[in-house]
Structure formats: C-alpha cells, structure tokens
C-alpha cells in the first residue's frame, strides 16, 4: 500500500469514526450494555478462530525473534480468552459515565449549574503486541460513548482482527454503528503517522507499548496524547515491615507476570529490615529463579549479580530485578524520584506515619501499601478493564477506564435570568 492509499484509507476511517461518535454520544446505556454482552458471546463463539489467528501471530513473532516477554504478551489461550470475555462483561455491567452529574450548585443570580460527563469523541489507540487491548479499548470506548480507531502492532495483526470481528458482531446485534469500533486493516507503519496528524478526526491518542512507541507518539503527535510510559515499579521494604507480608508481596510483585507494566523492577530494602531479617527477600527471589542485580552489601549474597548503574531506572519485563539497601524512607523516596517512571510504587510497612510520608512525598500515579504492584490494573481497580496506565498529570492518571475517557460540559438553567 503506497502513501497516497494509506492517507485516503485513514481519512475514510476518520470520517466514519466521527459520524459514529455523533450517534454514540446519545446512545441509550442499555444498547451499549447489550452490544458489550453480545460481543462477549461472540468472542466465545469465535474462540477457535481467535486461537487459530493467534497461532499465526505467534509464528510470525518467533520468526521476528520477539523476546519471551513480548511472546507472553502476544499469546492467547482458552484461559486468556475467558479473561477477555469476563472483561467485556465487567465493562458492560459498569455504571454508564455519560451524563453523570459530577457537581451541581445554585448561584445568587438564580442560575442552577450542573457539570456533567460527556464523551471525548473519537479515540485513537496505538498498541503493540497485546491482542487483548483490542477488546479492552473497544469496550471502554463504547461504554464511554466514544468511537475508537484501533491500530495494533504487526505482531498481533491476525489476533486483533479476529477479536475486532467479535466486537463488531456485538455492535450489529445492538443496532449500533459498526464504525464505532474500527481497526486499521494494514501493517503499514505509515498508518500510525497519519493517525498522529488527524486532528480533525481524532480527539485523543492513547499509545500502549514500550518506550520507543510512546516516545514516537509524544514527539510526533498533533493530537493530544494520554501517555503510558514505562512501568519502572519499585517495592520498598521498610524497617517496620511485617516479614511474612513482605516475602509474599515481593515475590508476587516480581514473578506473577514479569511482562506486564505492573511488575516490580527494583527492590529497595531498608537497612533496618536487613539487620532484623537478613537478605531473606533476595534469597526468596533467587530461589524463584529471578536474576537479582544487587548493589552494595546485597551484592555479597551468593547468587546475585553486581548491579550496573543502568540497571536502576530500567524496565526489564523479565525475571530480573535490581536491588539496593537504603537508609530510611526518605532515601527510598529520593531513589524513586530519580529513577521511577511515575507508574506504581509500593511500601511494605506497619508504621502509619512512614506510609503516609511515602504517599505524600511521591507523586506516582499509583501508590500502594502492603500490596503487590501487580494490582496496577484497571480490572483490579473495579473498572472492568483499562485502556492503559496514564503516567502524565493532565486529564487522566493511573488506570484509564470508561470514566477517564470522558470530558464534561456545563448545563446552566435560568428562569428568564439576565446579567446586570
């Protein structure tokens, strides 16, 4: 496909998306819910087709030499399809955000003012190897009354296509425009460049992928961007941490799934914790098969690898973690400020004042206490699904669910009221 053809294709998709968005903006909540539940049923009916398409993508990924983490993100199986289906049903059951009254008040002038949620319009989602993003993004945009243009990575091309077909089945059954959820039907990278320039057709771009993709989108987009940067997540074991809680959380935060953005990439151990309990957290990780890149006295633990400066502030997405000793919560905070990506940090402590200091003095999108960073997920937050974890400070932060995909307008009611 040459450049002219890609430009025309994307313009046509944009025009259709804008028309669909105008209709979706006033669609009844029951019709959107019906579409999502029907899409879930279609996903089950098409599961063999989806798995066959995913097999083709996995073969393509292996030929390209994708990393184990990327292959894990790409892979679908019956359990993961069930997870997608449950995600669709969960989003369907969420309260519809469109039209919700955020605030209302009366003015001395006699005016009654309401601030209510409205759709953003058209959302463009650019993502890499995760085919489930097709379903999550499509569902959340539909729930929030937005049309969406999906541009998946070349690795998940066939899987995304099969999932997209199920989403459109749901739209048809509910009598909603199929153009509400469109997929860019080409691997040509020129389509991404076109999306980033489509200010007349797209209201916001959501990039979902690695640092390279997000950086490209931020540098070149003329459309506003919800940035999802790297998940350089930290776990800090305070001197007053409960040992058994700490052992459970650290192991889960690193090893449950290493290829997701909520996986812990750096472990900070307070010197007081080390004095009480020894290097037990490091030993647990080593026994689980994690490569521990350790600094200072932790590098003396048998089986560890000496950390290099570049290991801190790095997203491994693998069975690797950086580790160092810190003197108190303030040193942990300073380290996270320097090396973190404003994604998710967890403190392990039984001291309320220390936890509050950690919460107040860090400004990551998600801060946790005595909980695994792997909970940094829209589904786990009760949103049904997420379109990404926004690490910026404008508009949306943290898991981006249906509510975060809305703006607002003011509805002002008077009674022949005039301004003097």
Curated annotation (Swiss-Prot):
EC annotation from Swiss-Prot or TrEMBL: 1.2.1.41
Reaction catalysis annotation: L-glutamate 5-semialdehyde + phosphate + NADP(+) = L-glutamyl 5-phosphate + NADPH + H(+)
Top-level taxonomic group: Bacteria
Disulfide links within the chain: none
GO cellular component: a single term: cytoplasm
GO BP terms, alphabetized: L-proline biosynthetic process
InterPro entries attached to this UniProt entry: Ald_DH/histidinol_DH, Ald_DH_C, Ald_DH_N, Aldehyde_DH_dom, G-glutamylP_reductase_CS, Glu-5-SA_DH, GPR_dom
Gene Ontology molecular functions: glutamate-5-semialdehyde dehydrogenase activity; NADP binding
Compartment annotation: Cytoplasm
SUPFAM superfamilies reported for this sequence: ALDH-like (SSF53720)
Sequence similarity: Belongs to the gamma-glutamyl phosphate reductase family.
Function: Catalyzes the NADPH-dependent reduction of L-glutamate 5-phosphate into L-glutamate 5-semialdehyde and phosphate. The product spontaneously undergoes cyclization to form 1-pyrroline-5-carboxylate.
Protein name per Swiss-Prot or TrEMBL: Gamma-glutamyl phosphate reductase
Taxonomic lineage: Bacteria, Pseudomonadati, Pseudomonadota, Alphaproteobacteria, Rhodobacterales
């Amino acid at each position: 496909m040459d450049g002219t053809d890609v430009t025309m294709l994307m313009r046509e998709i944009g025009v259709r998306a804008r028309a669909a968005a105008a209709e979706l903006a006033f669609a009844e909540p029951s019709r959107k819910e019906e579409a999502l539940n029907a899409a879930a049923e279609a996903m089950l009916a098409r599961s063999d087709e989806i798995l066959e398409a995913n097999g083709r993508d996995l073969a393509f990924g292996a030929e390209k030499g994708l990393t184990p983490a990327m292959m894990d993100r790409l892979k679908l199986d019956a359990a993961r399809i069930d997870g997608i289906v449950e995600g669709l049903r969960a989003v369907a059951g969420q309260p519809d955000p469109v039209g919700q009254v955020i605030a209302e008040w009366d003015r001395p002038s006699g005016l009654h003012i309401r601030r209510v949620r409205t759709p953003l319009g058209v959302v463009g989602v650019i993502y890499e190897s995760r085919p489930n993003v097709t379903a999550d993004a499509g569902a959340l945009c539909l729930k929030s009354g937005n049309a969406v243009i999906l541009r998946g990575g070349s690795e998940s091309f066939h899987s995304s296509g099969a999932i997209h077909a199920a989403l459109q089945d749901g739209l048809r059954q509910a009598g909603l425009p199929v153009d509400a959820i469109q997929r860019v039907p080409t691997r040509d990278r020129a389509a991404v460049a076109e999306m980033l320039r489509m200010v007349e057709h797209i209201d916001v771009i959501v990039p979902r992928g690695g640092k390279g993709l997000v950086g490209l989108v931020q540098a070149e987009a003329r459309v506003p961007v919800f940035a999802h940067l790297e998940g350089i997540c930290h776990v800090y074991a305070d001197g007053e941490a409960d040992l058994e809680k700490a052992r459970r959380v650290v192991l889960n935060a690193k090893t449950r799934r290493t290829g997701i953005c909520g996986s812990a990439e750096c472990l900070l151990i307070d010197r007081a914790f080390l004095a009480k309990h020894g290097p037990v957290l490091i030993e647990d990780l080593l026994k689980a098969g994690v490569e521990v890149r350790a600094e200072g006295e932790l590098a003396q633990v048998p089986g560890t690898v000496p950390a290099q400066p570049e290991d801190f502030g790095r997203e491994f997405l693998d069975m690797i973690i950086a580790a160092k000793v810190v003197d108190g919560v303030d040193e942990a905070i300073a380290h996270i400020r320097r090396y973190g990506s404003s994604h998710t940090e967890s403190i392990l402590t039984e001291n309320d004042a220390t936890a509050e200091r950690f919460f107040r003095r860090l400004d990551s999108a998600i801060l946790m206490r005595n909980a695994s960073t792997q909970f940094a997920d829209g589904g786990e937050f009760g949103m049904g699904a997420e379109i990404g974890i926004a690490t910026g400070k404008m508009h949306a932060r943290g898991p981006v669910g249906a509510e975060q995909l809305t703006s607002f307008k003011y509805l002002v009611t008077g009674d022949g009221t005039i301004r003097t």
